[in-house]
Amino acid sequence: MDQKQIEEIVRSVMASMGQTAPAPSEAKCTTTTCAAPVTSESCALDLGSAEAKAWIGVENPHRADVLTELRRSTVARVCTGRAGPRPRTQALLRFLADHSRSKDTVLKEVPEEWGKAQGLLEVRSEISDKNLYLTRPDMGRRLCAEAVEALKAQCVANPDVQVVISDGLSTDAITVNYEEILPPLMAGLKQAGLKVGTPFFVRYGRVKIEDQIGEILGAKVVILLVGERPGLGQSESLSCYAVYSPRMATTVEADRTCISNIHQGGTPPVEAAAVIVDLAKRMLEQKASGINMTR
């Protein structure tokens, strides 16, 4: 699927919702602007700000304009300079700040009020706390007994598509991107004439938990939106794992189709929603997912 096809899908889905599709972006990375190289170091600078990300630490550069253009083109750690054989203080502090931000989003919990505010049914895996989630991934692949009963009682049975949201390894990925991806995704699926299941939130879920969910609800396609393991400076990235007719005993990782890097600096959530709708339709047509799908 090329960029032109993706843009057409986005326009189609947004038009069905009565909204205007966003203008296509030329680049997939978030760029920062910096009028001129800045080499001074300040303790007052917010290390998470755009100014800090645009900071250039190379002193007395031969071609300052080249460094400025390079810094604008990427969010990678370039043009940070050195202090002898060591990183400059500003560069090291930003590295530590980004590491702390990534660690925080793994360890913190999705507030209970968040699910209620979104009107989502909340269930959990066999995990009871974050520490157990990180040390026992096998337990995150299965629903607890109470969750199984809740799904049977409160969710639509035998849907064409079942959408599931889970915190995974990034709380921020869910809370930041939810409002931009779920409404257009649900609207697009319904507009396509598909029977859509009741969306719900799974706390402490791993990817394979979608197999049990699909088996319990009799879903033809299960779409799991889950927080990715964060990288340095990027703690809001979401992934979509879609699978056709999942079964706990037989479904393997090659049966899943993954769309990763969903966030404002990667694949925009609205665009991802349109691509997921098209993917679900093709899965139902081909009755396959993962490596079994034809291009």
Swiss-Prot record:
GO CC annotation: ethanolamine ammonia-lyase complex; ethanolamine degradation polyhedral organelle
Family, similarity comment: Belongs to the EutC family.
Compartments reported by the entry: Bacterial microcompartment
Reactions accelerated catalytically: ethanolamine = acetaldehyde + NH4(+)
Binding locations of adenosylcob(III)alamin: V207, E228, C258
Major location (coarse): other
PANTHER family per UniProt: ETHANOLAMINE AMMONIA-LYASE LIGHT CHAIN, ETHANOLAMINE AMMONIA-LYASE SMALL SUBUNIT
MF (Gene Ontology): cobalamin binding; ethanolamine ammonia-lyase activity
Keywords noted in UniProt: Bacterial microcompartment, Cobalamin, Cobalt, Lyase
Name listed for the protein in its UniProt record: Ethanolamine ammonia-lyase small subunit
Cofactor(s) it depends on: adenosylcob(III)alamin
GO aspect biological process, one term: amino acid metabolic process
Cofactor note: Binds between the large and small subunits.
Protein's job: Catalyzes the deamination of various vicinal amino-alcohols to oxo compounds. Allows this organism to utilize ethanolamine as the sole source of nitrogen and carbon in the presence of external vitamin B12.
